Amino acid sequence: MLERLRGGLVASCQPVDNGPMDRPDIVAAMAQATVAGGATGLRIEGVANLRATRPLVDVPIIGIVKRDLGDSPVRITGTVADARALIEAGADIVAYDATSCPRTDGREDILAAILDGGAIAMADCATEADAREALSAGAAVIGTTLSGYTAETATDDDGPDFALLRRFRSLGGFVMAEGRFNTPDLAAEAMRAGADAVTVGSALTRLEIMTDWFAEAVRSAR
């Protein structure tokens, strides 16, 4: 499964929450369009979106559930129940928050549920320590997804964390570059820095965000 992703682009099809494109049928269409454009894998949020997409594509799907847990900053597949539901819906790979942030269901329990369900586990990490712990516990994929999004790693830099990506390369495991790789040049640089694959989201599937980038550039040029 991971060999099918190696050297390729993963399209994260996650429309803006509650926006006009936030519907399972539209997410599935986005997924088909990105595969037609050359994506070798998909990252799909939500069980309903995953169920709508799975029958329409034959590329590997990374499934996640995003939800606010209230008593925890963890938002990505933060419960055992969510991990199991994603596997039942057809996820080949389940990504989960592998940081040390407090949560009700321990990250070890979530990882165990993914592996027990027969899926591949992807650890969404913020630090090298997160990745090391995830790999030792059985995760096959380590992603730079959460660098810059935790209290420990918060930064004003709006670019990707290439330093972390390079450190991941030395750890073993399948390295997924993810998080602010929003131009073709940055995606290519990620591969040169040692990524096995690159995930791109907002620049491909969040039209409101992309439109705002262009609109702001035009306004500021007046």
What are the language-model segments listed below?
Residues 22-26, 74-81, 106, 156-163, ...:
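Alpha-helix N-cap and loop-to-helix initiation/capping positions
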Residues 38, 57-61, 89-93, 115-119, ...:
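Glycine-enriched alpha-helix->loop->beta-strand junction motifs that scaffold or abut catalytic
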Residues 1-84, 88, 129-136, 181, ...:
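Conserved N-terminal beta1-alpha1 strand-loop-helix module at the mouth
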Residues 30, 49, 53, 79-86, ...:
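A general structural detector for well-ordered alpha-helical segments in enzyme core domains, enriched
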Residues 16-21, 161-222:
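Alpha/beta catalytic cores of nucleotide-metabolism and tRNA/nucleoside-modifying enzymes
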